[in-house]
A protein has these predicted regions:
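Dual-mode signal for accessory low-complexity, basic/Gly-rich regions
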Residues: 294-363
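Active-site lining segments that contact anionic ligands and/or coordinate catalytic metals
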Residues: 262-264, 280-282, 289-292, 315-319, ...
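Short solvent-exposed loop/turn micro-motifs enriched in small/polar/acidic residues
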Residues: 15, 206-208, 276-279, 313, ...
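Glycine-rich, charged/polar anion/phosphate-binding loops
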Residues: 130-132, 200, 208-211, 251-254, ...
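Active-site bordering "gate/hinge" segments
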Residues: 1-264, 395, 401-403, 411-413
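Short linear motifs in exposed loops
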Residues: 225, 295-296, 406
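Extended hydrophobic packing segments that form well-structured cores
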Residues: 368-413
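Long, well-ordered mid-to-C-terminal structural blocks that present hydrophobic/aromatic surfaces
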Residues: 256-312
Length: 413
């Protein structure tokens, strides 16, 4: 690497993810999912976790090339099946209340050209099989953090004009370190100050308890109802054991769940979405009485239709997140083709499941109680970006009065 002080900064990054991200405590079990290309970072993460007293660190390796070959050539019945040993591993991790650290670095187009029905069948099977883990994660029963590492093919997509593959990787690592505050003199303090700023916005919105939100922008005119006693959350979270953690590194969002029964109007995406190894652009969605009645995409249309119409609960929304256009990630002008970063450059919505913590007492509710409270239940959760510097958002009170929240893509509340 030619990036100055790369090894030193990679070590700082690993410490940040383990100590502040999933917040490893003595006796914790840690599940790390990471690509084989990122072995150097994986070694650092494992060492840091054990240094903080982890009882066990389980590494779940992935490989884009192997995954692609499997999707192209494996028998269809194997694509549609989740092996028993994978379910057993999930049950083991749940029993141990394992903290989950997912490091994303995949090529956004790794599965381009794979038949959409094969991808859809696999996504549906894994969604059903790993539902208990999804529920535990989305109700913060365990600590979980999603982070990123600079994969070569991903870096080439983000920086196509780089003079070499090595330069592209360096440029992407530089952006990851910047957005995760690794370059700060005291990254831990910098994260606390950032989280405090986001928490202040969440408190204002929680006090307001708006009945609905109204989004307006070119290609968008959408009204989303909000559940009674909804909760706006921001950077930090608390697991069922009372331990703090950071779900996303980086993050710029304040988010809650809409009432899945109350969505009317239409919305257009403003950034590409990388989903299931495909890049999807120009998404347009129409809602009536909470349900998606039409969805199209200029690129990846069949993939999106399969997502929405072939997965349980995917015809409704599970998240609405507010991100100011002047956020550092947005102002970088870079499209990352990675939801972790692109969602933190833009207001976004999520198709599918809501986080249980988006309503008061939700972490202790049954699936049926969550649904009665207005939180969508689904086997999927897929964010897509809708924000821009032309977006206005109003909060609508119970009496119909409106309060400006965003004007021209930025906070005014």
């Amino acid at each position: 690497m030619v990036l100055p002080n790369f090894k030193e900064n990679l070590e700082k990054y690993a410490k940040l993810l383990v100590a502040n991200g999933i917040n490893v405590q003595p006796g914790h079990t840690v599940a790390l999912s990471i690509d084989v290309e990122q072995a150097e970072l994986a070694h650092l993460l494992v060492k840091e976790a054990y240094a903080l007293g982890a009882a066990e660190v389980i590494v779940q390796w992935s490989d884009d090339i192997i995954n692609r070959e499997r999707f192209l050539h494996a028998d269809m019945d194997r694509i549609e099946e989740v092996p028993a040993y994978k379910k057993a591993e999930m049950e083991y991790l749940l029993a141990k209340k394992a903290s989950r650290l997912g490091v994303r670095s995949s090529d956004p187009g790794a599965l381009n050209g794979v038949a959409p029905e094969r991808l859809s069948a696999h996504a549906k099977a894994t969604g059903v099989a790993f539902k208990p883990m999804q529920v535990a994660t989305q109700s913060n029963k365990v600590s979980w953090t999603v982070a990123a590492a600079a994969g070569k093919e991903w870096a080439k997509k983000v920086f196509p004009d780089a003079s070499s593959d090595e330069e592209a990787v360096d440029l992407l690592w530089d952006q990851i370190f910047k957005t995760c505050r690794v370059y700060e003199e005291d990254p831990v303090r910098a994260w606390k100050e950032h989280a405090d700023r986001l928490d202040a916005k969440a408190r204002l919105l929680n006090e307001a308890q708006f009945s609905a939100l109204h989004y307006q922008a070119p290609g968008t005119d959408l009204t989303l109802g909000l559940p009674k006693n909804h909760v706006w959350e921001s950077a930090g979270a608390i697991n069922a054991q009372g331990e703090g953690f950071l779900p996303n590194m980086a993050t710029e969002e304040v988010f809650t769940a809409p009432d899945f029964r109350r969505a009317d109007g239409y919305v257009s995406s403003t950034k590409p979405l990388s989903y299931n190894g495909n890049i999807i652009e120009g998404i347009k969605v129409t809602f009536k009485d909470g349900e998606i009645v039409d969805i199209t995409a200029d690129q990846g249309d069949e993939v999106m239709k399969n997502l929405v119409f072939n997965n349980n609960g995917a015809r409704a929304l599970g998240e609405c997140a507010l991100v100011p256009d002047p956020s550092p990630i947005s102002q970088s002008g870079i499209t990352f083709f990675n939801t972790l970063f692109d969602e933190n450059a833009s207001n976004h919505l999520a198709i599918g499941a809501a986080y249980a913590t988006s309503v008061e007492g939700g972490a202790d509710m049954t699936e049926e109680e969550l649904k009665e409270a207005g939180l969508n239940r689904s086997d999927v959760h897929v964010d897509f970006m809708i924000g821009s510097n032309q977006m206005d958002i109003d909060g609508i009170r119970q009496d119909g009065n409106r309060v400006p929240i965003f004007r021209n893509g930025d906070w005014v509340i």
